[in-house]
Amino acid sequence: MITSLERFTNLGPSSINDLEMERDFIRDTLEVLRATGEISNDAFLDAGTIQGGLSLLLNLLTQGITEAEASLQLNSLKERAGSLSRTYPDLDSKVESMRK
């Protein structure tokens, strides 16, 4: 999941579409990985915080927060994704393997 977030550096109104696509990719991928038993329910629920964080970030961007505020939110999500990578070492590679 950290790989997904590392794609984003500067956020602003022009990045809303890309963030929406990434959020949807993460949501759909996590559902498939859980349904096929490739990740545990705990990993699914914990990783859902990244999807939720992206949704929050999207809402804030549409409300016009500054790029600095958006960067703070993104950095917080990256820290959470790093923690997830330590807890579930294979999660990032499993998510990325689903990318077309």
Where in this protein do the model-derived segments appear?
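Amphipathic, soluble alpha-helical interaction motifs
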Residues: 29-32, 36, 57-60, 87, ...
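Short, flexible coil/linker elements and helix-boundary hinge sites characteristic
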Residues: 10, 37, 63, 88-89
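Exposed, low-complexity/repetitive linear segments and helix-based recognition motifs
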Residues: 3, 17-19, 25, 43, ...
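Amphipathic protein-protein interaction modules
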Residues: 40-79
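Short terminal alpha-helical segments
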Residues: 1-36
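Amphipathic alpha-helical binding modules
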Residues: 65-100
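Charged, amphipathic alpha-helical oligomerization/scaffolding segments
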Residues: 14, 18-21, 25-28, 49, ...
